[in-house]
UniProtKB/Swiss-Prot annotation:
Reaction catalyzed: Hydrolysis of proteins to small peptides in the presence of ATP and magnesium. alpha-casein is the usual test substrate. In the absence of ATP, only oligopeptides shorter than five residues are hydrolyzed (such as succinyl-Leu-Tyr-|-NHMec, and Leu-Tyr-Leu-|-Tyr-Trp, in which cleavage of the -Tyr-|-Leu- and -Tyr-|-Trp bonds also occurs)
Enzyme class at the top of the EC tree: hydrolase
Record's subcellular location: Cytoplasm
Function: Cleaves peptides in various proteins in a process that requires ATP hydrolysis. Has a chymotrypsin-like activity. Plays a major role in the degradation of misfolded proteins.
Organism: Campylobacter jejuni subsp. jejuni serotype O:23/36 (strain 81-176)
Gene Ontology MF, one: ATP-dependent peptidase activity
One GO cellular component term noted in the UniProt record for this chain: endopeptidase Clp complex
Top-level taxon of the source organism: Bacteria
Pfam families, per database record: CLP_protease (PF00574)
Name listed for the protein in its UniProt record: ATP-dependent Clp protease proteolytic subunit
GO biological process: protein quality control for misfolded or incompletely synthesized proteins
InterPro entries, per the entry: ClpP (IPR001907), ClpP/crotonase-like_dom_sf (IPR029045), ClpP/TepA (IPR023562), ClpP_His_AS (IPR033135), ClpP_Ser_AS (IPR018215)
Amino acid sequence: MFIPYVIEKSSRGERSYDIYSRLLKDRIIMLSGEIHDELAASIVAQLLFLEAEDPTKDIYLYINSPGGVITSGFSIYDTMNYIKPDVCTICIGQAASMGAFLLSCGAEGKRFALPNSRIMIHQPLGGARGQATDIEIQAKEILRLKTILNDILAKNTKQKVAKIAKDTERDFFMSTQEAKEYGLIDKVLEKSFK
């Protein structure tokens, strides 16, 4: 992946930054692509860094993700709740599966999407191999995770758990306006809110 660099001029000279480092100075974190352990570790580190820099200022988490590993997503979710600053979530492009879950986990009143974003929720995916006993253990674990995800989505959207469970049985796609009505986001952004 090509990462652009920007040059900042000051009275002390010029300094170049990769674009993500420059955005981090403005408290912006980009969650882009499939969510896995390596990406989650980077997001968690940035959240913790920004909290240490200033625990009173909001953090802006831009999401463009098809989803990914549940435990990786949970590490981001738990950190969002652990730190003091509010985390504003903004969907750009798509927020599907774990991406949509994290979008819904932004601070209340601070969950946004750009107009042409695509949002999708569904039940967790899993693949089990091995002996019958191992498959049974994996099935129980994925059902446990499904319950946790549904409970958190119900809390975030103010929907009943039964509705979340029904809607996530299959891929459930929403426009940004539908996601707002559903309670996954608070507002569709036409212009920057900063």
